Amino acid sequence: MRTGRLEAFSDGVLAIIITVMVLELKAPDGHTLSNLVHQSGVGLLTYLISFVYIGIYWNNHHHMFHLVERVNGGVLWANLGLLFWLSLFPFTTAWVDESSFARTPVVIYGVDLLAAGVAYLVLQTVIIRQEGAESALRRAVGRDVKGKISATLYLTGILSALTIDRNGHVGTGIAVACFVGTAIMWIVPDRRIGRLVRQNEKSD
């Protein structure tokens, strides 16, 4: 099976996830900037973080499948596993918003981010197994340093929220900083993948 249907389905699911998240945003009661900041500020911040993450996954997913010609059943199921965890973003994002970054919602949000990262790694591994050890994707991924750093930051954030200043906001603040830092790291594109995609397009 070629990758077109899988990519189209994934794009549609990600678009729906973003739509659901933005529909969860609540307009402030007043008409001033102060009303916006105090009543909708947390919601806008959590939406922004989650939107960036969805954008990162869409971008990486798009580039990854440019290096793949066909998919099998294992790839389809691994892709569904990734979409499952990403589809929970509207729920976990809304909970963090409504709780104003309370400890348990932040921990669950971090677990969702970690699970999505693991699911992406599983998808990547299944594709490499299908394509072979010398495949373009395997060369592009290399030692996957970013993936290892990401998992470490997610775990650091989760553990910080669970153990540091349990009655205050220091632990959750560290957790959010870890999650934002991970997103910033992934916003910077991996030039190796871009080069390999261009090489594949030229060879076609």
Report each predicted region and the residues it spans.
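Multi-pass alpha-helical transmembrane bundle typical of ion/small-solute transporters
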Residues: M1-D204
